[in-house]
Amino acid sequence: IARKNAKNDCLFRFRCAYQPGTLEAVAYNAAGQETGRCAMTTAGPATELRAEPEEAVLRPGQLCYIRLRYTDQNGVLKPTVREPIRVQVTGGRLLALGNACPFNLQGYRTSHTDPYWGEAMAIVEAGTEGCVTLQADSTVGSAVAAVQVHKE
């Protein structure tokens, strides 16, 4: 779209007409060398619920953080989707479920939450050997995260 030099507030504003696609910002240092790059892509029309564990394998009693996200079919986050999410855990114990909203009246000790900007997080404690499974359901769809539990 254009280039601008940094000012004291490090805020850059550009006026442009909206069109779907990818918008990319590129940062350069004083010598003109690229120092950073960030892109945003328009989400597609379809919406799905995803459950993404941070770990692939756990030890008994270990905590697993499972990210719940509303995305399009390509995994692009859909931050305006606010459908409530309900979870059920087997092979472990749900310790907390919630979002990053600074004003959360529901608390974090329930099996349901509203997403904040399209996302929520579940914290699960692994049980004994086997598999810990989180089933997430909403009006949009369902998602499952399964993580193996092994004694070392």
Q: Predicted regions: what is each one?
A:
Residues 32-44, 142-151:
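Edge beta-strands of extracellular beta-sandwich domains
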Residues 18-22, 63, 129-131:
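Extracellular Ig-like/FN3 beta-sandwich strand-entry sites
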Residues 40-61, 151-152:
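Low-complexity, Pro/Ser/Thr- and charge-rich linker/hinge segments at domain boundaries
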Residues 46-50, 88-104:
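Short aromatic-acidic-glycine turn motif
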Residues 26-27, 61-79, 85, 134-136:
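Beta-strand-rich structural segments
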